[in-house]
């Protein structure tokens, strides 16, 4: 027997049934996707789909060459034909904005776009952190005021309500100011951290030289006292940045959205400025961040487009659905409405016709294939979770009748005219 080929470590199959180490099913996932589609439409967002492979330069330019994502985590390879460096996308914003610039989508109006799909990072796999993971992203492009900042946070809070997990999530916010303000803060931060360089761990020493703001994001408990006393970026904000942040907070207050100001919240990608935020939970262990985002007013220009102030966020689907599966609510209906079975050598064709007629009327029908006893077929109908069973027997063909059974018992088992099949099932379903 040939050796089995396993899936790549950290990349999961999505199956109709739960797995030992990955409890999410395809039906649960599909129910979430349906919810997201309805949710985004209510806010006027249109879907965009981009390739999972992009030129590596896109991420170097947008995310930042010195970030952990670009430096250590991307799957990068050369195209065999022209040695062009390509990468599997590690996040969705850069790809979305590349498409916007390439196709000139902002030529006459702002855009509200959303995406959903797989991302890839070479990380140590653990629950809630995978090498192939999935995100839903929201991008509001060409909007300058703090009102859109507040709106997209209200939008995310609305989704948490729909999923029944709002009480388990905490909103953290901060302002990173503009480029000049960050540069002034960076100089002060480097001077401060250099005094404690001998106490920093190796990762923080590397970040001190490449992206000192990320030192403040360390999870090392031995460095918390040093980081808490570090210069705060909020103290370097100019009047315009302060006003934007103050108006943003006032809008959250007016919407009744509670938040915590976290001056150490910096996000892991270099393109952010002004407003940044994260939704976190204490229900998922170390993987506390479920959703995060912020402003990236200079990114479209950095990618070759005309300047356009923008803001967005992304949520990790796996983490979010783990939270929903344990604490929230999501209506999942993977079972068929009807399980159609047959007895007799000519009944199989007729049951196929009945099944097709029911599908045209909106019923989900699973049709039995093969020839088994009625008892065996009924067992499969029960295992399928179908609400109703349709039985077509050989002796019913001549008199134009069928047998219907309500698997929940409410209507029992009845023989009805084939012409009344659809109406009867509709009445039972709506009762």
Curated annotation (Swiss-Prot):
It is found in: Cytoplasm. GO terms for cellular component: cytoplasm. GO terms for biological process: histidyl-tRNA aminoacylation. GO terms for molecular function: ATP binding; histidine-tRNA ligase activity. Keywords: Aminoacyl-tRNA synthetase, ATP-binding, Cytoplasm, Ligase, Nucleotide-binding, Protein biosynthesis. InterPro entries: aa-tRNA-synth_II, aa-tRNA-synth_II/BPL/LPL, Anticodon-bd, Anticodon-bd_dom_sf, His-tRNA-ligase, HisRS-like_core, HisRS/HisZ, HisRS_anticodon. The keyword ATP-binding applies. Its EC number is 6.1.1.21. SUPFAM superfamilies: Class II aaRS ABD-related, Class II aaRS and biotin synthetases. It catalyses: tRNA(His) + L-histidine + ATP = L-histidyl-tRNA(His) + AMP + diphosphate + H(+). Homodimer. Belongs to the class-II aminoacyl-tRNA synthetase family. This is Histidine--tRNA ligase. It comes from Neisseria meningitidis serogroup C (strain 053442). The lineage of its organism: Bacteria, Pseudomonadati, Pseudomonadota, Betaproteobacteria, Neisseriales. The gene is hisS.
């Amino acid at each position: 027997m040939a050796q089995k080929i396993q899936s790549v470590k950290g990349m999961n199959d999505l199956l109709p049934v739960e797995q030992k180490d990955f409890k999410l099913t395809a039906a649960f996932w599909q129910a979430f996707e349906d919810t997201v589609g309805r949710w985004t439409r209510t806010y006027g967002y249109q879907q965009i789909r981009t390739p999972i492979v992009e030129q590596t330069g896109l991420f170097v330019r947008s995310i930042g060459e010195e970030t952990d994502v670009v430096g250590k985590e991307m799957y990068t390879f050369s195209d065999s034909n022209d040695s062009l460096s390509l990468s599997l996308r590690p996040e969705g914003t850069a790809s979305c904005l590349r498409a916007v610039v390439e196709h000139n989508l902002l030529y006459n109006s702002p855009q509200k776009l959303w995406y959903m799909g797989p991302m890839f990072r070479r990380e140590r796999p653990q629950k809630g952190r995978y090498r192939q993971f999935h995100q839903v992203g929201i991008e509001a492009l060409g909007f300058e005021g703090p009102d859109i900042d507040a709106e997209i946070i209200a939008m995310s809070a609305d989704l948490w309500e729909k999923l029944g997990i709002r009480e388990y999530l905490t909103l953290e916010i901060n302002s990173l100011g503009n480029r000049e303000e960050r540069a002034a803060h960076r100089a002060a931060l480097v001077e401060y951290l250099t005094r404690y360089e001998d106490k920093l761990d190796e990762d923080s020493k590397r970040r001190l030289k490449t992206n000192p703001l990320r030192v403040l994001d360390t999870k090392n408990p031995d460095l918390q006292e040093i980081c808490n006393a570090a210069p705060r970026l909020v103290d370097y904000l100019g009047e315009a940045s302060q006003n934007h942040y103050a108006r943003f907070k006032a809008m959250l207050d007016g919407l009744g959205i509670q938040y915590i100001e976290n001056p150490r919240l910096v996000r892991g990608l270099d393109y952010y400025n002004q407003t940044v935020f994260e939704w976190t939970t204490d229900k998922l262990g170390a993987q506390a961040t479920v959703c995060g985002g912020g402003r990236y007013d200079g990114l479209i220009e950095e990618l070759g487009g005309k300047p356009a102030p923008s803001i967005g966020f992304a949520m990790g689907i796996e983490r979010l659905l783990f939270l929903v599966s344990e604490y929230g609510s999501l209506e999942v209906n993977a079972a068929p409405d009807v399980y159609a079975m047959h007895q007799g050598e000519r009944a199989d064709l007729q049951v196929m016709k009945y099944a097709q007629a029911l599908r045209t009327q909106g019923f989900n029908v699973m049709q039995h294939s093969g020839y088994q006893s009625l008892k065996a077929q009924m067992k499969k109908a029960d295992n399928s979770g179908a609400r109703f069973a349709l039985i077509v027997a050989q002796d019913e063909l001549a008199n134009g009748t069928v047998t219907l059974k309500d698997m929940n018992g409410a209507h029992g088992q009845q023989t009805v005219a084939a012409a009344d099949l659809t109406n009867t099932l509709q009445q039972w379903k709506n009762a």
